[in-house]
Amino acid sequence: MTAAPGPALTPDTVVANGVRLHYRHGGSGPPVVLLHGWPQTGHCWRHVAGPLAADHTVIVPDLRGYGASDKPTGGMDKRTMAADVSALVRGLGHDRVAVVGHDRGGRVAHRWALDRPEEVTRFAVLDIAPTRATWQRMDAALGAKYWHWLFHLQPDLPERLAGADVEGYLRYFLEKWTYAREGLEPAAIAEYVRAFSQPGALRCGFDDYRAHPVDAEHDEADFSAGRRVTQPLLALWGAEGVMGQTLPMLDLWREYADDVRGRAIERCAHFVPEERPEEVLDELRTFLAEA
């Protein structure tokens, strides 16, 4: 299940785009940035980051509002979050990077590639479809499975209810969205619970979803203007997950990007980097080597 370890990554913090970001970095070679989703932190890349650092410079931030990074009261739209990570990597001396995003991190990667195409050489998205396309297909069947998108949009109430039992709320998703349960070991779940038990962490996580009106405005403007992703794009998803069983993933990405490849990963649901890290590594190494 766990890939062979590579170089250890070093934790650090930096102020980027006005917020303090925690990140880990290590290795040498072409730079690649790994972006996590909800309800997680950069810890979700623990099985992938080290081995990938054997031949890449790997940068793993906690996105604004998550993990050990600042918990601001605004700026959870994907344009701002992408600008944060852009400032981080430029501060580290990298003008052009490959990006890999899981879940919400994939949405940040998509926005980064559109807003700053000169910085993103290629990117991979794990277990997400384009945001605009997903909302367009939010019928009763998909809404019943992705109800949290609608619930997390509500002001204040998600924090009040989830805050009464942070561990119970997170475990619901971490367990229900997982096929290969051994990939999310108890220590990892405990780390995510700890991270979201910090002051402001639940609010920021829900604000990530509540930024949808702003994100939708940006997405619609790009689509209407015919602005597409021109970089090579790799899409991977869990064959047992909601996305893979509900939506035509590659077809949807081809509506938004010119150069798309990818596949479903068997015996895997949503948490792809943890459930099937060796397959993710194989796919990423092949994809990144094409640069």
Segments (PLM) and residue ranges:
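Catalytic histidine-centered segment of alpha/beta-hydrolase-like enzymes
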Residues: C268-R276, L281
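Proline-centered flexible-loop/turn and helix-kink motifs
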Residues: P39, A54, P117-E118, D258, ...
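Conserved HGGG/HGGXW glycine-rich cap/lid loop of the alpha/beta-hydrolase fold
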Residues: R24-A68
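Flexible "cap/lid" subdomain of the alpha/beta-hydrolase fold that forms the substrate-access gate
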Residues: T2-D12, V19-L21, P31, I59, ...
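Conserved residues at beta->alpha junctions
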Residues: H36-P39, F196, E275
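Short strand-coil-strand connectors
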Residues: V15-N17, H36
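Alpha-helical elements of the RecA-like P-loop NTPase motor core of helicases
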Residues: G42-R46, R203, D282
